[in-house]
């Protein structure tokens, strides 16, 4: 679908039903504009979303929602004036524009002409996941996943699965004349199992997703999700209490990158650096990590959960190098913070919906691979912990301090992975941990497409990833 077709799709969904041709949008900008206004935009959004769940062998259509609305924003210096409406109409737009202008407390006017089309390479197909399977097929998919889990081992007592899909159409009209549209599909499938043995119960989970439709959940993927979830639960049934203390920790590839995302990635977002609240503020060009550590944010990877063709300000996403060979090289920016910091836009302006303000946010954030074979990394450890999967955690974004619980971990003894352990928590400081990376694997892996990031009350889909990493001297909280 080319740019004109995307715009036509968005116009048909968001503008034409409400008689909002370009002339009327021009009038809204005219009512909104002020002499010292630095920027302004209108953000139209239409979303259909559904959720299906399976528990105790029963599939339920848990949710179905249709939401639409428009957000009106004006920027003056560091100030943002914002109003939104869940009604799309010329009258509602005029009201929102007046409210926004009143917040800005400025007078005057400036015409805007919505003529230019914004263009960016497409990162996914404009699919409608909800229409890609009928209801019976969605039920059958969840039931098959349950059967696969139970068939793997008789100790599996409970299976819970969730299937979700979203079809989103957005249109961004900007005061500089650009008009950009995007059609964003999103799907997610997750499963959790509980296994029981000798009165002990343990859980395991798996799943995946991306910007595509339900066709991605092939039989092979369902079998892999079942294997991962059940195997994790069975490993935890045999796990010993984790030791506590300061030790070498090896992080597995893929989803353990969530620690990098939370404890380090947020500190590389423009707003925290502009306000001086990030541990990385004022350190551009300085060494902030061990040699060999390169961290990027890339919103252009095809079909990934965190990818976007354009961000929520209509700017094309890109690959941004944040840390290069241990040196701080870049930050993630939206238009407000890029302008105030006099730094380039990176296409990271994101919002949960039309009713939320844009913030600089991550897309797919990961550490690049190094030169070491993962087996070599394990062999180098005399005594330590191998954490291959994470559960929940807490992070202080300002300081980078974190506590993360390992959902699956093992002891490393004399260069070998030995027994599984349970109850391990990793405790540390993100920027400090970056300096303690001593070996980087050649096995970069991205997460399976399940991540959601929260910031200032807003949730957006993201991707994470990393290769196998050896971290010297990290505090481990245990139960032994």
List each language-model region with its residue ranges.
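N-terminal small-residue-enriched
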Residues: 1-480
